[in-house]
């Protein structure tokens, strides 16, 4: 299962429309006007581009968004977050059906409203991926980031930290060893592991074949959260 959020394409489209995303506590604050752009780009161009790329590589992908089949339901976080919502319910019935048929679900992170205040919310891809992993009983959650955001190995600064114990996360956040941009990803992954996901790993998504190298090599190339 592949989950994606607001990437450079959506940010560029917003910029072209004269809008810019503001971030708060790791969440992009999406206005009503911005949501229209985000939904079009996220569920259209980005989602279908990923589906096409997977299919061309021999996969059998299908594009979905969190609204489809009631997959993701959300409520408002607070007025200051605009139309960015908090995921309150995950229904993986449809996802399991597609998995059983051999499809790779590719999920854009917009959700249906569950609070009567809005029909649609933009939701954090980090939160959505973590909650989906829990609901699916996933063996592994992989969060992709860039090299600058990876957790660095203190003994070899050019290499990622191979393991990170859950108990050490709060202190590393306080000290700044976990960069501000990674705090949200790390916290979501910690919650997923504590909720039953077997393991969570952070990978530099700019490395060619990063996921294969992590899954198929003995040493891996990312940082794995451990109990």
PLM regions and their residue ranges:
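Nucleotide/pyrophosphate-binding catalytic subdomain
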Residues: 1-206, 213, 219, 227
